[in-house]
């Protein structure tokens, strides 16, 4: 309680103080005072709860001066230990694992990595899905550890840079268009087979085609004609024995006259046929085979 007294005093004048003095009460009393104390108490409780929750979050999330939990902030970037889940897109410049461990990217649906230009357009994409791996780019390359290109794909060609391309499928390799290669050979215990089931098979080389079987034989089977044609050279059959077992055979002459010998006759169109050998040529006797 504060009492204020207002008295005017004039020099040389004596005034007696009144018996009834005015008293003014300044402050908060009653239920307002109790509500104020209650509000301050609640505010203090909320402050303590917030402080306790802050301490608990710091302990649970493993906050430290260098980062949060397994996530450490270093001069080179962010260092993350253990497994992490990203619920939204992740934009980074470089991702690499520790020296003693591998890098694993895993998702229940698919893993998609995009490369964008300065305008935000996708210039390259790698998508690993549950059924296929999809690559979208102008060129796809696989290099060896020393930087040698092993496999290159673009819109115009597919290039294999290895010393050997091996196809192990039971159906072999299927090519819808032409193939350029300096050498085609099978595994040592297997046979080499070139087949075109419904169309023709063509082999072209400006400096020649060499077919060699050092330890076996070469067979050419066809239902129609086999044509050996040389425009400026010679067709050479270089062997100790040349057999033509299915040549047309003329009629047999008198018994004992030929002694089992035949002569090879040539028609004007190049057709060959056999005629029983005699004292002289007998080709004209069987010239009807040329008709």
From Swiss-Prot:
Post-translational modification: Disulfide bonds are present.
Glycosylation sites recorded in the entry for this protein: 110
Keyword Repeat: no
UniProt keyword terms in alphabetical order: Cell membrane, Cytoplasm, Cytoskeleton, Disulfide bond, Glycoprotein, Membrane, Signal-anchor, Transmembrane, Transmembrane helix
A GO CC term attached to the entry: sarcolemma
Disulphide-bridged cysteine pairs: 265-290, 267-283
Pfam families: Sarcoglycan_1
GO BP annotations listed: cardiac muscle tissue development; heart contraction
Superkingdom, natural source: Eukaryota
Extracellular topological domain residue ranges: 59-291
Location(s), subcellular: Cell membrane, Sarcolemma; Cytoplasm, Cytoskeleton
InterPro entries documented for this protein: Sarcoglycan (IPR006875), Sarcoglycan_gamma/delta/zeta (IPR039972)
Subunit structure: Interacts with the syntrophin SNTA1. Cross-link to form 2 major subcomplexes: one consisting of SGCB, SGCD and SGCG and the other consisting of SGCB and SGCD. The association between SGCB and SGCG is particularly strong while SGCA is loosely associated with the other sarcoglycans. Interacts with FLNC.
Function: Component of the sarcoglycan complex, a subcomplex of the dystrophin-glycoprotein complex which forms a link between the F-actin cytoskeleton and the extracellular matrix.
Record family assignment: Belongs to the sarcoglycan beta/delta/gamma/zeta family.
Protein name as annotated: Gamma-sarcoglycan
Organism phylogeny: Eukaryota, Metazoa, Chordata, Craniata, Vertebrata
């Amino acid at each position: 309680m504060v009492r204020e007294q207002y008295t005017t005093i004039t020099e040389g004048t004596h005034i007696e103080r009144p018996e009834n003095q005015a008293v003014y009460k300044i402050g908060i009393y009653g239920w307002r005072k109790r509500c104020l104390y209650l509000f301050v108490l609640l505010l203090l409780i909320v402050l303590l709860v917030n402080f306790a929750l802050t301490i608990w979050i710091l302990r649970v999330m493993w906050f430290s001066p260098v980062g949060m939990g397994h996530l450490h902030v270093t001069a080179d970037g962010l260092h993350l230990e253990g497994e992490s889940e990203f619920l939204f897109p992740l934009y980074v410049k470089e991702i690499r694992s520790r020296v003693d461990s591998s890098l694993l990217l895993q998702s229940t649906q698919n893993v998609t990595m995009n490369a964008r230009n300065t305008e935000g357009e996708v210039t390259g994409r790698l998508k690993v899905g549950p059924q296929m791996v999809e690559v979208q780019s102008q060129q796809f390359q696989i290099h060896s550890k020393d930087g040698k290109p092993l496999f290159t794909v673009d819109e115009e060609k597919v290039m294999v840079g290895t010393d050997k391309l091996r196809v192990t499928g039971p159906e072999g390799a299927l090519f819808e268009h032409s193939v350029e290669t300096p050498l085609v050979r099978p595994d040592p215990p297997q046979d080499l087979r070139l087949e075109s089931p419904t169309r023709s098979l063509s082999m072209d080389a400006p400096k020649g085609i060499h077919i060699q079987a050092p330890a076996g034989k070469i067979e050419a089977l066809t239902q129609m004609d086999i044509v050996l044609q040389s425009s400026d050279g010679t067709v050479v059959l270089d062997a100790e024995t040349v057999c033509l077992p299915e040549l047309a055979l003329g009629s047999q002459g008198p018994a004992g006259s030929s002694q089992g010998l035949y002569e090879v006759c040539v028609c004007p169109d190049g057709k060959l046929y056999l005629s029983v050998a005699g004292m002289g040529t007998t080709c004209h006797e069987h010239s009807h085979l040329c008709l």
